[in-house]
Amino acid sequence: MAKTVMTMPPRMSTEEWQTRLDLAACYRLVDLFGWSDLVNTRVTARVPGQHDQFLINPYGLLYDEVTASSLVKIDAEGNKVDPSESDINSGGFAIPSTIHMARPEVACVLHTHSIAGCAVSMQRDGLLPLNQHALQIIGDIACHDYEGAGRSAEGRARLLADLDDRHILVLRNHGLLIVGTSIAAAFIATYRMERACAMQLAFQQSGAAFHPITDEVVSAASNRPTGGRNEPAKFEWPALLRRLDRIDPSYKQ
């Protein structure tokens, strides 16, 4: 694969190009961490300065094929804003669009079908307060019951009500949906949730007795939402981009 880094296209704002770079990097990182599902699921980002314009992956590309220039700009209904030969999964954009339009602070919506996330979504009690990783996010998690593959307006309204003002939504029997005030925030919240889910599964498989955390500590964590904060942009996100650049910087094309 060619690794030439592309410069910003003419007539595109610096802010949009930076968002494209971050979103393409996010797709590559989701794949690198093992959370992708062939060409299914998606990560969407709001175009800076545009309330109703968004970037999404071209339908049919694997996550490790997505580049900054291949991302498709669409409106809230899934219509292409700029000419593009690429198709998108317009049906799959219905839920992200609903969230983006209802919550203007949400810059990124990240949806996964990961093994750990799906496995925990199938458990009656969802993510349990078993360890420090879970407690970091436990107060920022909501759940939404599976309603089939349909995307009716009523179903989207119920999903939005369940998410409320939180940033992590367990889609029961389906997967995870994470929102963030930046692409970096959404990715790091996903990392924390995926890590906590994997730890829960590993513990459950061990068959060992659980050493409980006190109710006071769990209660304090439950009342301290942290999942969508922007701090990850300061340290973790640049570090992840450096790692990606060492592996394959072609996402910048």
Regions found by a protein language model. Name each.
Residues M1-Q253:
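Glycine-rich flexible loops
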